[in-house]
A protein has these predicted regions:
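Electropositive phosphate-/nucleotide-binding environments in soluble metabolic enzymes
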Residues: 1-6, 54, 74, 86, ...
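Mid-domain Rossmann-like dinucleotide-binding core that forms the NAD(H)/NADP(H) cofactor-binding site
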Residues: 1-74, 78
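Glycine-rich cofactor phosphate-binding loops and adjacent beta1-alpha1 units
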Residues: 15, 58, 63-141
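A local structural motif
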Residues: 44-45, 88, 166-171
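Residues in the short beta-alpha loop(s) of Rossmann-like NAD(P)-binding domains
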Residues: 52-53, 124, 147
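Conserved beta-strand scaffold positions in the cores of enzyme catalytic domains, especially
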Residues: 68, 141-143, 172, 176
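C-terminal hydrophobic helical "lid"/dimerization subdomain
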Residues: 102, 106-109, 114, 152-204
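Active-site PLP-lysine loop of aminotransferase-like
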Residues: 143-149
């Protein structure tokens, strides 16, 4: 988990977040779940997480998100607007990626508050990302990570967070399998995302 936690620290320190702002994290896979915990060091007013898998929503709730939106049965844009009294999110962090992430990016634009920021940290495939110029007036879009701190410093901070429990990883582990079942592990992750999140391969 340390490499992903390190990258998550760098991403969250790249994102321009002011204390008290509302942060929405789209996608609660491993990276999204790590970011939802690490972003707390930026003192947001509220952290809202969004996913389409009930299992991931349940885990996100256990990890302390202020609000969890299950988009399998809820309109995420409408829910975010309601939770922010119509304003929208100050910051939206897009962690879905892939083909599904294209629609998620559209929703990010719809739920973003005036002068808000969308931070893309996922990889996308298929069609180009749709950007609505009118909707994006007076807003910011950033991608990747730009940070003055060296990766080694962020890795040390990530390790400290894992050790002292500020970032909880054991809740992310849904399965432990012997290494001989590596193909089954990948099949589970790609074909049954509603049943698995973190799969650990064990060598005895």
């Amino acid at each position: 988990f340390l490499p992903l936690a390190t990258s998550s620290v760098m991403w969250m320190r790249t994102t321009p977040i002011d204390p008290g702002q509302t942060v929405v994290i789209l996608g609660q896979g491993i990276v999204g779940a790590l970011c939802a915990q690490i972003v707390r060091e930026r003192s947001p007013g509220s952290v809202i997480t969004v996913d389409a898998q009930p299992l991931r929503c349940e885990i996100s709730s256990k990890l302390g998100s202020d609000h969890v939106i299950d988009v399998s049965n809820t309109d995420s844009v409408k829910a975010v607007k309601e939770l922010t009294n119509g304003k929208g999110a100050d910051v939206v962090i897009e962690c879905v990626g892939g083909n599904t992430g294209i629609r998620s990016f559209e929703q990010a634009q719809e739920m973003l508050a005036p002068e808000g920021v969308i931070h893309l940290i996922s990889k996308y495939q298929g069609a180009p990302l749709p950007l609505d110029g009118d909707r994006f007036m007076n807003k910011q879009l950033i991608a990747g990570m730009r940070i003055d701190q060296p990766r080694e410093r962020c890795m040390a901070d990530a390790a400290e967070m894992l050790i002292d429990g500020r970032v909880r990883i054991f809740d992310l582990i849904t399965h432990r399998l012997p290494w001989e079942q590596t193909p089954e592990a990948y099949h589970m992750l790609y074909e049954k995302p509603g049943e698995a999140l973190g799969v650990i391969l064990e060598w005895d």
